[in-house]
């Protein structure tokens, strides 16, 4: 292991610090043939990773200018080991083969917290690790779980670590060299343009709640439950095509309201995000009104939803793709739960409908359109969004407060067939995000396929966390039930349409 003095302490950016110290987890499953060789490969790869990026072995402490990453102290007897190996003799891989398809999906229960190297919430007033690893040995393989401190990494930054680790396992001689991920840029994070940009607002007083004042803060939070939902790629493509077929009408409606430029396409990610947010909003409304007779509850509700947006390319100059720090801020949009009577639509609308009732279809199409409009203008508006996020009321970021109806982030652009870990580990069977702890969290998981030839028909796996009452209603929403894999059959595997998935 490299010496702890191999890097200079640095202060985390205001955007890093705004996310707070909470750990999230990536869990990668492998069906290994030689357990000893696999363990040796992982340990060697982690050592090499620390040699190239020694700050990963650091710890986070409070300093004059805020949170700081420094070399670890040597006298911390209770310090969580950097790498742990645990055997679970009564467990098997959390992997399920999806019917006759070539795809694996996460088994429909959350990974046990025992698989995680440390707790999600760190001990207050103590130095906190930057990253920790745990190798979980089960009867038919192993699960490598990586715990990332959100004050140091966002989801994409953590994915850089996974890519570097894969390269360290597969081809250690080339890690960090030309043609591979450049680690040097991540080590100079303190000089990044993002630090200079966000530091402009560092001295602004963030609103602090000295004591909880609203019922939402003081009430006991409802029990949370989470499941991995498997969406049929064929159904989502049909829904996307249907939404795109009515873009002319949606563009005309938007021009009447705001004079916005035309939207040229809606991606599968837009449409899936819209479907998830629409169905969660409907489920929350239904959970609050146990009587499903909408005639007794004619009032509509407006729900705010959030979607994480990567600002690496918006910053001037742009941040490198391998920037590991936080560079994501929320894009906000609203959903109204009111459903009008079935509109009398032209035949073109009726023919475009993929199978949902017309009101649900139009609501999803309009929300997907709103998302695309906001994404198109995000380059001009992200500064305001960033300023707002950095100066948000801290009481609204507490883990027990419902910050939004739904919070969607997507890792779909990460493709497991591009993450080759070498012969000892083999291909990734599933790529999970562990257990989210926020009510309304929706994580679109990485594209899990063994080759690009079948990527186009790979299911969309989404880990969703909701309170129990809302989850019950959510699982009974017709639009959700229609879109899930069990309700459809994939077509012949095909190549991935990158523009469609963007």
From Swiss-Prot:
A Gene Ontology BP annotation from the UniProt entry: terpenoid biosynthetic process
Stated role: O-acyltransferase; part of the gene cluster that mediates the biosynthesis of calidodehydroaustin, a fungal meroterpenoid. The first step of the pathway is the synthesis of 3,5-dimethylorsellinic acid by the polyketide synthase ausA. 3,5-dimethylorsellinic acid is then prenylated by the polyprenyl transferase ausN. Further epoxidation by the FAD-dependent monooxygenase ausM and cyclization by the probable terpene cyclase ausL lead to the formation of protoaustinoid A.
Similarity comment text for this entry: Belongs to the fumigaclavine B O-acetyltransferase family.
Key word Transferase present: yes
Acyltransferase keyword on record: yes
UniProt KW keywords: Acyltransferase, Transferase
Quaternary organization: Monomer.
Name of the protein: O-acyltransferase ausQ
GO molecular function, one term: acyltransferase activity
Known EC number: 2.3.1.-
Note: In A.calidoustus, the austinoid gene cluster lies on a contiguous DNA region, while clusters from E.nidulans and P.brasilianum are split in their respective genomes. Genetic rearrangements provoked variability among the clusters and E.nidulans produces the least number of austionoid derivatives with the end products austinol and dehydroaustinol, while P.brasilianum can produce until acetoxydehydroaustin, and A.calidoustus produces the highest number of identified derivatives.
Annotated metabolic or biological route of this protein: Secondary metabolite biosynthesis; terpenoid biosynthesis
